[in-house]
Amino acid sequence: MSQSLKTYYKEKVVPLLMETFEYKNIHEVPKITKITINRGLGEASKNNKALESSVQELAIISGQQPVITKAKKSVAGFKIRDGMPVGIAVTLRSKMMYAFLERLIHLSLPRIRDFKGISVQLFDGRGNYNLGLKEQLIFPEIEYDRIDQIRGMDIAITTTAKTQQEGIALLKALGMPFNDN
């Protein structure tokens, strides 16, 4: 796909979805509002190096500086006190969001071992999609020699779709490789 994902959405996906779901107004067509990338780091409270390397990796992957999330209250069972770092998150919107989604669909997901497509059952029922990745090595920006530990991440794709069918149709039209199960 030589054209950007945003122009592809406007020129091809919007007319397709308007015809499929019989929308009367162009503003009824679902669109992606944001992509949130999140990584929980339980060891971040003890290991500051893990936190720094994760911040650096997520900044490379997303192209945007992540925010360090902190514990809201103390939990003795997890040995965490109020205000300790427990993870990192980055929210992508607009140009960065479409650039990341294009790289995810066309470069990163096909690099997963034994990849047969992603599950349709990861929708939340309101058109939002939540994807969990086991390792950061599927992104071509990450060099194997520079990582200290393999860590996963959660990717949440938030859409304006009202139903699960609309969300599936939107992401499928954008090229998301769903499996048939």
From Swiss-Prot:
Binds 5S rRNA, forms part of the central protuberance of the 50S subunit. This is Large ribosomal subunit protein uL5c. PROSITE patterns: RIBOSOMAL_L5. It comes from the Eukaryota. Belongs to the universal ribosomal protein uL5 family. Its main location: plastid. Keywords: Chloroplast, Plastid, Ribonucleoprotein, Ribosomal protein, RNA-binding, rRNA-binding. It holds the Pfam family Ribosomal_L5. PANTHER family: 60S RIBOSOMAL PROTEIN L11-RELATED. It comes from Rhodomonas salina. It is found in: Plastid, Chloroplast.
